[in-house]
Amino acid sequence: MALPLLPGFSLGRNVGKEKFHKSQHWGYCNNVAMLLAEDKPGIGGEPLPGQKLIPKSSVFPAELGCGAPAWLAFDKQVLSFDAYFEEEVPDKNQEPYRIRHCKIYFYLEDDTIQVLEPQVKNSGIIQGTIVRRHRIPLPSPNEDQFYTIDHFNINAEVIFYARRYKIIDCDQFTKHFLRKMGFKLNPPGNRPDDPYTKERQKILDSMNPLRPYERIDTLKQFLEHDGHVLRFYCVWDDPESLFHDPRELVLHYYLSDDTIDIKEVIPVNSGRDVVPLFLRRDKLPKYAPTGLYQPGTITSRTVLNVFGNLVGNRGRYILDNRKTGAVHQEFYRDSDLKIGAVINVWGRQIMLCDCDEFTKDYYRTKYGIEDFTPVPYKAPPPPKAEKPIPPYTGFGSEEDSLCSCMSLLPKPPQKDFKKFMEKDRCGLESNTLRFLAKLVTDSPIDKDRKFIICYFLMMPLYSVFEHSQRNTGIIGGKFLEKGRIKKPGQELFKSEPSEYFKAQDLFIGARVCFHGHNFLLVDADEYTINYMEKHANEFAVADTGFIFKKLKDIAEPRSREIRQVFAAADPQHTKVIEYDPFRNLIVSITDGAFSEHEIMTLGRHYGEKEEYEIDHHFLLAKAQEQLKKNSFENFEQLSTILVYNDREKCGALPYETCRTICKSFKLPLSDDLLQTILTMFEDDHKQVNYKKFVDAVNWREHQIPSFHTIKLPPKNEDDWNGQPPFLPVKRIKYLPLLDDLFGKEE
């Protein structure tokens, strides 16, 4: 007995309820008030007492969270069933019924069904779509309902519009989906064969034609060699021409169908008309021309009339396997083409003289031919006549005067824009070479004057500045404005272009003459020396390999004497000597054949490098400061990913793996700082201890007090005052130099 609906004795039935609408049960039909539907629910969509609602579409299990609707969750997902149905064949004793196989597709998004019948050869039935895609109602008396996913299973029958379909199997996706839905699948059924089709197949298999048609299949050759073309360069000596001038041709052999086309190379101003093709693409017969054949003479098959005109006007035609009276033609194949061969192109003798690289690889691979020596078929081109250039007039620059002589309309000279963009100043790269120079003179006043020679790489221009000195009576500043400088000893009015000073003419120890002033280059700034060493292929005085070879050729005959000289310069046996004694020894050994720049390059190569110790504490503090400024706190997730990539669980990962993971996390550290910190935690096997690395940069748990960076004034290269820089190499390790020159002493 149910409890009465008294306050405090009943639960709140409307708790969590959102729908409170009433269904429309009554209405008008032909202006008559009547009950329209008895299956409509009550208030809020809840069923009435004793009412059982039947879902109008398939009901799928609810997913976790907010599930998507069926039309979105099951978009483009289809269940496929293999089925068949029996069809009666009236008035035919040989075929009382027919088995027709079909496919049933159930679309999960909207419960629509489609039935397709695959094509069967010579069936005589219109096949394809039997039932178009739509929702199919159930058979009577439930025609007000539609088929859903619950009505389908293996070895089950469905009725579509009075036609009974037997489902025998389904695909793997359908089986997996139905199992997930909770269906218990039946075992697959047998696929029955159509008796009449089976009988017809037996008859066809028993038939053995005595004269089968010859199979001509070129599909394989087309698929293997489509787009593969052999190219030969040919020549044809036309005997009908007046001067028997050779005609250059290009022959293309198409491997996909063994056809050939030929194009003629028309020289410029030859007087010949340009035609698209010398020979259109087709198979080329070897023995041609042989006359014209009547239509039907050349066919792919030969047919015989067995009875002729004996039986009225009706004949009996069969295939002639012996091909009596057939015309056989031989065509050029790829095996007939080779360099030096002469082929017949419809009566014209054409010689194959050369081929391209693809053709050589093809013949080398297929036929094993290695000799591809081309046949010379044309004389070398005559040397191009040089255009006489008038001498320089003295007005404007030489390039401007030369451009006015090249064409009727004068054009301005073209500048090297690419070099300008590559060598233009970019950030700290000034692309300017600076040298300290002195005047070569006997004047006691001019001897002490110092000049800075600047060479701008973006445009080959020079500028000279004089360094101002106190109590000299000479005002410093610009000595020579920016511009090009000609080498001395050249005529002014001449046809040949003048020679100008280049970057290769400037090095420490060089003597240059700028407009009558002789300069001796005595020093250079650090940027210039580094630039010349970095581009050693352009500057021979900064090429260590070239200098070493030059020194070895001079010093090799006196190896023992040179070892004794260097040993005498190092009485304490420290294996190093100062730069000045080293320079004096090289000058004495080479008898002045080496310039100051070459000696300095050699000293920089074998000099002692000052090693700077890295302050790990300072680097970690800088790294934590950068991470803190960028609010990076995903250290736990970073550690988890590093542990996940550690398959061997050894606590270490390769350097590149750690760097890649840090980059994928967008760790806000500069690349050089990240590489340095990772190197700090490497072991002997180049493995990084990632746990220590994460703990070191974790500013939340292991914070390191920050350092106060001392801001130094930025060094500007343009402020170089010409004073000799701090010598970058003080001590030279001479033993490695001697070992490289003469080998290790035993």
Curated annotation (Swiss-Prot):
Microtubule inner protein (MIP) part of the dynein-decorated doublet microtubules (DMTs) in cilia axoneme, which is required for motile cilia beating. The gene is EFHC2. Keywords: Cell projection, Cytoplasm, Cytoskeleton, Repeat. Residues 557-592 form the EF-hand domain. SUPFAM superfamilies: EF-hand. GO terms for cellular component: axonemal microtubule. This is EF-hand domain-containing family member C2. It holds the Pfam family DM10_dom. It comes from the Eukaryota. InterPro entries: DM10_dom (IPR006602), EF-hand-dom_pair (IPR011992), EFHC1/EFHC2/EFHB (IPR040193). Residues 75-182, 226-367, 429-536 form the DM10 domain. It is found in: Cytoplasm, Cytoskeleton, Cilium axoneme. Transmembrane segments: none annotated. One of its GO terms (biological process) is regulation of neuron projection development.
